[in-house]
Curated annotation (Swiss-Prot):
PANTHER family: 50S RIBOSOMAL PROTEIN L15 (PTHR12934), LARGE RIBOSOMAL SUBUNIT PROTEIN UL15M (PTHR12934:SF11). This is Large ribosomal subunit protein uL15. Binds to the 23S rRNA. Residues 1-55 are annotated as: Disordered. GO terms for molecular function: rRNA binding; structural constituent of ribosome. HAMAP family: Ribosomal_uL15 (MF_01341). Residues 23-35 have a biased composition (Gly residues). SUPFAM superfamilies: Ribosomal proteins L15p and L18e. Keywords: Ribonucleoprotein, Ribosomal protein, RNA-binding, rRNA-binding. Part of the 50S ribosomal subunit.
Length: 154
């Protein structure tokens, strides 16, 4: 087989439409554009979304604001005040909080929030701490360990 012997497969090519060549050619007179009207004239026609003067759909629908962030980090959150029921000097992780029943669902890595008071020293391992939570934990004699959140739930 040589390059000059190549041919397209049967049915792969389609003849172009020759319009305006007489009525017996099939696309004569109005060339497939119908009778009269804006769509049969030359030029661009109507713009996308135009509904003939009726208020178009894209203007009838309200403008929506404040879309949620698509890649927002999702944390399992708990307040400092809820940790007061744990044993003093214990290590607190997401798993120990689930075992203790303080957290019922795992929504992602653990984040400690600063609402409430803490009087016992705890070693807390979490992905994130608020500034107020970190101050309260360290004031109670505990420590905050920031661990990297490998499996980030999004």
């Amino acid at each position: 087989m040589n390059l000059h012997e190549l041919a397209p497969q049967k049915g792969a090519t389609k003849r172009r439409r020759r319009v305006g060549r007489g009525i017996s050619a099939g696309q004569g007179a109005s060339c497939g554009f119908g009778m009269r009207g804006q769509k049969s004239r030359s030029g661009t026609g109507t713009k996308p979304g135009f509904e003939g003067g009726q208020m178009p759909l894209y203007r009838r629908i309200p403008k929506l604001k404040h879309f949620p962030l698509v890649n927002r980090r999702q944390y399992t959150i708990i307040n400092v005040g809820q940790l007061a029921s744990l044993d003093p000097n214990s290590e607190v992780t997401l798993e120990t909080l689930m075992d203790a029943g303080l957290i019922t669902t795992n929504d992602g890595p653990l984040k400690i929030l600063g609402n409430g008071e803490l009087t016992i020293p705890l070693t807390i391992k979490a992905a994130a701490f608020t500034k107020g939570a970190q101050e309260k934990i360290e004031a109670a004699g505990g420590s905050c360990v920031v661990e990297s959140s490998g499996s980030q739930k999004q």
